[in-house]
């Protein structure tokens, strides 16, 4: 019987991200997928700033950006008339080293991640489906459709909305399906490609166009007209007049066209014993805001370092409980918020139509205000995700609480995020480090990085001469305005953190 520390089921963006992080943590794994290779079609296509920050920790961000397209401007139109526009390229200036959303087609994205895995000597086992599994004796015993059996310390179900992992665990997947049908098409438009997002509001709901590939391909997304909703033979030619009406230019070439329904569901649990759910296996939601794939990658990062720390004896196994307690509430909140936003965009009732016609245009005008722009960026980029109520979160200093994402500070070479590339617990001090703190950190085998105090650190909400213990995922675990070394030692003891 084959044995592995971690069995990853599913080689989409979530499973691939989990595999890459485990590889960088030097944790062995197997990754299997029922399909014959990476996906050939692209649904998700927006990579948010937080995902790029997480990619930077493993040296991938620059390559992803080079292959993707930075959105320059977002235009909001109603009835063919522009009612608002928003500069996207520097929307989050000062908040992140990546102050923009990036368009990067999911199929290209998956091939890129798979290639990086291969370069690390890690093979994806295609045409290998999970058939069944059970847990006994502190192990996962999995049966694969190939007839092979596999024993694992842990199993991560990253196998999508039709997750076999979730099915075997018997977990509920409550939620629903929106009534409308939607179309998606990758096309070549007449004229030069613009790196802009265009949202067209009207009685037909919302229709979007945005760049998807560097070869000049544009992604079109919208609602199928009501009179065509029940057709199962719908082709792009059938909706072409509808599309032409809202984009205002001719479609010269259609590379891909599909229709689909949108669902919103969250699994009742993200962990049962030694098995975990991540990505679409645990939550699916509307495409509003481009959150789905990024949330799955966030799941993978959260789970990866906890598995690595446990398997390598750095922390106790109880830390794995915090995967569900940190990620499940966020998934529920995200599904609820995207459901409200999506319903407002697509509903055909009088209230929704009035909102699109009157309220949204006026709200869009507020994006000229810097505070509104910053709030908008923090929300869509996932920088606002925090774990303040987690068992792993303690203390605060300045505006930064335990559980918050470490604020980015543009200081030195690469900013304060450069030290996060070690994927290890790490102490930051902004100002002067006390000897007692350094001694306590050394006893726990924690590196300490001291940054010169700066206006940029103050603007980010960091307290002068404060100490912050940063988790391997870039979130703050512990903070102390007084560099309380005894408090750091007590925190480490409480969560089971010990010297490697």
Model-found features: residue ranges?
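Conserved FAD-binding catalytic core of PHBH/FMO-like flavoproteins
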Residues: 66, 108, 115, 122, ...
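Glycine-rich FAD pyrophosphate-binding loop
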Residues: 23-43
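FAD/FMN-dependent oxidoreductases across multiple families
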Residues: 67, 233-291, 295, 315, ...
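Active-site-adjacent segment of FAD-dependent monooxygenases/related oxidoreductases
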Residues: 43-116, 211-212
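Core beta-strand elements of the Rossmann-like FAD/NAD(P) dinucleotide-binding domain
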Residues: 4, 145-154
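Helical substrate-recognition/capping region of FAD-dependent monooxygenase/halogenase enzymes
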Residues: 2-5, 9, 24-25, 34, ...
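A conserved short coil-to-beta-strand element within the FAD-binding core of flavoproteins
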Residues: 126-140
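N-terminal Rossmann-fold NAD(P) dinucleotide-binding loop
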Residues: 15-16
């Amino acid at each position: 019987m084959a044995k592995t520390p971690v069995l990853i089921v599913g080689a989409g963006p979530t499973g691939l991200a989990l595999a890459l992080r485990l590889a960088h943590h030097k944790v062995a794994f197997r990754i299997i997928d029922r399909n014959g290779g990476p996906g050939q079609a692209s649904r998700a296509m927006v990579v948010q700033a937080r995902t790029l920050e997480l990619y930077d920790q493993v040296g991938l961000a620059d390559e992803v950006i080079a292959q993707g397209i930075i959105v320059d401007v977002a235009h909001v139109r109603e009835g063919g008339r522009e009612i608002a526009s928003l500069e996207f390229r520097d929307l989050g200036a000062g908040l992140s080293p990546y102050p923009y959303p990036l368009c990067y087609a999911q199929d290209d994205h998956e091939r890129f991640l798979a290639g990086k895995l291969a370069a690390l000597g890690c093979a994806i086992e295609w045409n290998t489906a999970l058939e069944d599994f059970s847990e006994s004796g502190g192990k996962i015993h999995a049966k694969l459709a190939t007839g092979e059996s596999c024993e694992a310390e842990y199993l991560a179900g990253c196998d999508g909305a039709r997750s076999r992992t979730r099915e075997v665990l018997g977990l509920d997947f409550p939620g629903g399906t929106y009534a409308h049908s939607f179309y998606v098409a990758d096309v070549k438009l007449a004229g030069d490609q613009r790196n802009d997002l265009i949202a067209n509001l009207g009685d037909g709901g919302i229709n979007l166009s945005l760049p998807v590939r560097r070869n000049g391909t544009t992604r079109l997304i919208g609602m199928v007209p009501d009179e065509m909703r029940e057709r199962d033979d719908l082709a792009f030619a059938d909706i072409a007049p509808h599309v032409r009406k809202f984009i205002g230019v001719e479609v010269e070439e259609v590379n891909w066209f599909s229709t689909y329904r949108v669902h919103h569901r969250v699994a009742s649990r993200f962990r049962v014993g030694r098995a975990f759910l991540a990505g679409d296996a645990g939550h699916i939601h509307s495409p509003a805001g481009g959150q789905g794939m990024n949330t799955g990658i966030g799941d993978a990062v959260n789970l990866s370092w906890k598995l690595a720390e446990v398997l390598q004896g750095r922390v106790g196994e109880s830390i794995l409980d915090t995967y569900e307690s940190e990620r499940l509430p966020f998934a529920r909140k995200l599904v609820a918020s995207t459901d409200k936003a999506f319903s407002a965009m697509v509903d055909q009732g009088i209230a929704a139509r009035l909102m699109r016609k009157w309220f949204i245009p006026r709200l869009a005008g507020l994006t000229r205000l810097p505070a509104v722009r910053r709030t908008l960026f923090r929300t869509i980029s996932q920088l606002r995700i925090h774990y303040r109520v987690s068992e792993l979160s303690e203390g605060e200093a300045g505006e930064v609480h335990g559980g918050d994402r470490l604020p980015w500070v543009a200081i030195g070479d690469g900013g304060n995020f450069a030290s996060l590339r070690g994927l290890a617990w790490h102490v930051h001090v902004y100002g002067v480090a006390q000897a007692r703190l350094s001694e306590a950190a050394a006893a726990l085998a924690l590196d300490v990085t001291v940054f010169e105090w700066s206006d940029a650190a103050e603007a980010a909400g960091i307290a002068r001469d404060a100490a912050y213990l940063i988790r391997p995922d870039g979130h703050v675990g512990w903070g102390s305005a007084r560099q309380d070394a005894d408090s750091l030692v007590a925190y480490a003891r409480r969560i089971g953190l010990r010297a490697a």
